[in-house]
Design a protein with these regions (language model features):
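Short beta-strand/loop segment at the start of cytosolic alpha/beta domains
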Residues: 1-17
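Amphipathic alpha-helical interaction surfaces in cytosolic regulatory modules
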Residues: 22-98
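Short acidic-hydrophobic, aromatic-tinged amphipathic segments that line or gate anion-handling sites
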Residues: 100-104
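Inter-domain helical "communication" segments and dimerization helices
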Residues: 6-9, 40, 107
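A short acidic, often aromatic-flanked loop/helix-cap motif at beta-alpha or helix-coil junctions
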Residues: 14, 106-107
């Protein structure tokens, strides 16, 4: 599977889809891509991990950094479609104390 990011703007929200690995090999590229994507709207952002095969600690750091970026504009970040293993890792990292998990993105 190719490692890439795609996004859609649905109504007032931005949905970002991560494909392949979310690991240290791709974080620099993804960080700059995400900054541009997040600037395209004012509403909530959903990170959809349904096509993500692997997430390491740098991937969690990337998510946390984008959360902080959105907080400056009083915007919310939601996480969606995590695998059971990834869900557990995000839970142990305390991510759900900062952002909400949703089973799927509606809209």
């Amino acid at each position: 599977m190719e490692n890439k990011i795609e996004y859609k703007i649905l109504e007032d929200k931005i949905v970002v889809y991560f494909y392949g690995e979310l690991s240290c090999s791709y974080i620099g590229k993804y960080r700059s891509l995400l900054s541009g994507i997040l600037d395209k709207g004012n509403g909530p952002v959903y990170f959809d991990f349904s096509k993500t095969s692997f997430i390491d600690s740098s991937g969690i750091g990337l998510v946390l950094g984008r959360y902080n970026q959105l907080q400056l504009d009083h915007r919310k970040l939601y996480l969606a479609n995590l695998s059971k293993t990834a869900y557990k890792v995000f839970e142990l990292a305390g991510m759900f104390e900062l952002m909400e998990y949703v089973e799927e993105v509606k809209g």
